[in-house]
UniProtKB/Swiss-Prot annotation:
Example of a GO cellular component annotation carried by this entry: cell cortex
Keyword Isomerase attributed: no
Name of the protein in its database record: Epidermal growth factor receptor kinase substrate 8
Region (Helix bundle 1): 718-738
Record's compositionally biased regions (Polar residues): 1-10, 17-30
Biased composition (Basic and acidic residues): 671-687
Family in the record: Belongs to the EPS8 family.
Species whose genome carries this gene: Pongo abelii (Sumatran orangutan)
Region spans: Helix bundle 4: 766-785
One GO term (biological process): regulation of actin filament length
CDD domains xref list: PTB_EPS8, SAM_EPS8-like, SH3_Eps8
Functional note: Signaling adapter that controls various cellular protrusions by regulating actin cytoskeleton dynamics and architecture. Depending on its association with other signal transducers, can regulate different processes. Together with SOS1 and ABI1, forms a trimeric complex that participates in transduction of signals from Ras to Rac by activating the Rac-specific guanine nucleotide exchange factor (GEF) activity. Acts as a direct regulator of actin dynamics by binding actin filaments and has both barbed-end actin filament capping and actin bundling activities depending on the context.
Amino acid sequence: MNGHISNHPSSFEMYPSQMNGYGSSPTFSQMDREHGSKTSAKALYEQRKNYARDSVSSVSDISQYRVEHLTTFVLDRKDAMITVDDGIRKLKLLDAKGKVWTQDMILQVDDRAVSLIDLESKNELENFPLNTIQHCQAVMHSCSYDSVLALVCKEPTQNKPDLHLFQCDEVKANLISEDIESAISDSKGGKQKRRPDALRMISNADPGIPPPPRAPAPAPPGTVTQVDVRSRVAAWSAWAADQGDFEKPRQYHEQEETPEMMAARIDRDVQILNHILDDIEFFITKLQKAAEAFSELSKRKKNKKGKRKGPGEGVLTLRAKPPPPDEFLDCFQKFKHGFNLLAKLKSHIQNPSAADLVHFLFTPLNMVVQATGGPELASSVLSPLLNKDTIDFLNYTVNGDERQLWMSLGGTWTKARAEWPKEQFIPPYVPRFRNGWEPPMLNFMGATMEQDLYQLAESVANVAEHQRKQEIKRLSTEHSSVSEYHPADGYAFSSNIYTRGSHLDQGEAAVAFKPTSNRHIDRNYEPLKTQPKKYAKSKYDFVARNNSELSVLKDDILEILDDRKQWWKVRNASGDSGFVPNNILDIVRPPESGLGRADPPYTHTIQKQRMEYGPRPADTPPAPSPPPTPAPVPVPLPPSTPAPVPVSKFPANITRQNSSSSDSGGSIVRDSQRHKQLPVDRRKSQMEEVQDELIHRLTIGRSAAQKKFHVPRQNVPVINITYDSTPEDVKTWLQSKGFNPVTVNSLGVLNGAQLFSLNKDELRTVCPEGARVYSQITVQKAALEDSSGSSELQEIMRRRQEKISAAASDSGVESFDEGSSH
């Protein structure tokens, strides 16, 4: 029910892993042996001896480890792939380009084979008999994957061996390698069994720093009863009703906002849009990887003669599985929220503009709709609704193909809140991001007020999500005859499972969420009490190794979100959250009021746009050039005439216009002329505004709006580099641009000329932020050309004149004429 209309059960089930590092399974039942034994003393002695021996055997029979499959290479001299070191070198290159796609699985070792098992279905993916394993090696701390297990396997049917690489976090690669090597040694008939001792060593090994959690810590469990559902929804509805009549036109007090307030609000919207685009990009890459794996799997099956599964097909089958339905629903919700944000930011972002980004987003939206087998699943996504401004903006912006796709998604994508029945409950939308990031609070709204409203909205959204899952569970028991999902093309959803339900059925399912017209909050509702914040100071630098961890620098002040385990979840001053080991943190006293969590400085760019698919050609005129007034944080200005943006690539930077500048009126006027066809007197409902601006525009009390809001200004000097810059200058410039330590250390050894000589692909190979570095270098080059172009031309003309004068003085008028003719 969390914005999802569903009448069909989901056939996906999650199986929690019971294997954490080391496990075992007995080989036979001791009870049967006891029943078959004689009662003589000799038999009793033999029985006890066998029991002791078999206890060791049962412990060392099977061991299981949770690992991440990184990639598989074919060892071929033609590809310069001969040794494990060659594979690690190629893994580094793939990692630098962002082309490593990990897959969680179970690696199982027994006395006959090494097997790979699907984490969810528990099906065996691959089976490598011990006699086919030619080499086993642990590679520690050689790249960003710090615990790599390498297996070289060659079956009799293969011409060339395969190199399989795994990242091992929970149990380190050197321990797993010892287990496999001992199993291989024992299988060759050695007199002394090595494996029991190896397994005892593994089970007694001190893990050192504990492994990070696989997912953020869960919220405290709460009882979600029918009364709880009604009271929470009543509280939300009462608050919404208290803000104004249902059909009352919008009476926002944006005119009372200071330029600093508006800048802070826009900054946060841009950050949210950044993370939405990142999550959509990640999901699209996931789909593309699944499609590539399915294509390779189909190719192998066509060329295969027998029915026996070939080497590597098990892992390919796992990689070809599409994402679960909940991830598709989350992606569709982020598309809708992204469109709402673009409509709000259309006057504030440029290069590319909001209209360009709309064209860009329709390309992956079309891909996701096709991957689900049609618009049915997207049509079931109710929350968040597009607001009136967004619908008008899309009507004005989209081209013919985009409009056809948009209209095919139905009323949940084309109707604003005012067009839905008043009694129709629309759950609030609280976006959750893959890396755990949460939008920073707006200080001028009052932290307590905004946090209470945010928690209320999140509580209602959680209740709606719980109700939706309960409904799916109930329907799955009633309709057990529904066929399971079997993709026809490896990543397309079966349309007979996800069909759009009628609004009548959806209304019946939401009967528990019927809002009340009462203007007062239910007195039985008790808002969540906020715990006092705790802070810690990092003693050392720590570099994150995966998406759940957080990179921190020495002396960083971090807010502690969860300290119940050995790895603490913390949030830095920029609003990013993740896990760090608790032994690098010192508890500190909370900072003074108002200084606990400052708004992060605005970066003025949406940087991470690395998707390879490009936007359709836009029908709108190009974005206006940036205003001459500098932005709040000084950055080098681009040249007056920006270079044309190629259609096949998405631009790397999105800058926003300075909304607090008095000189930006020209750009705003031009923008208003572009959108003059948009109706300006459209009425909006208050509930629509609640849906549109759930997180960061819930309310601003009139008393709070009258308070003077001060944003501390940072006098950051402008740092530029030239072709003559030293490596120290380059390092300082990289740090001033906010690049991570890996990028600074990798490129900080180059001088200005060397850095300017690198192209985008070379930069991407050197560091993960290569695309962003290239865009900043382009800006620097343009600024240098703009400032030095005229002086260089004058220098060339001066040298030419000196050469002509010298020729004239040496050879007379005739020589001068000859020089002129040339």
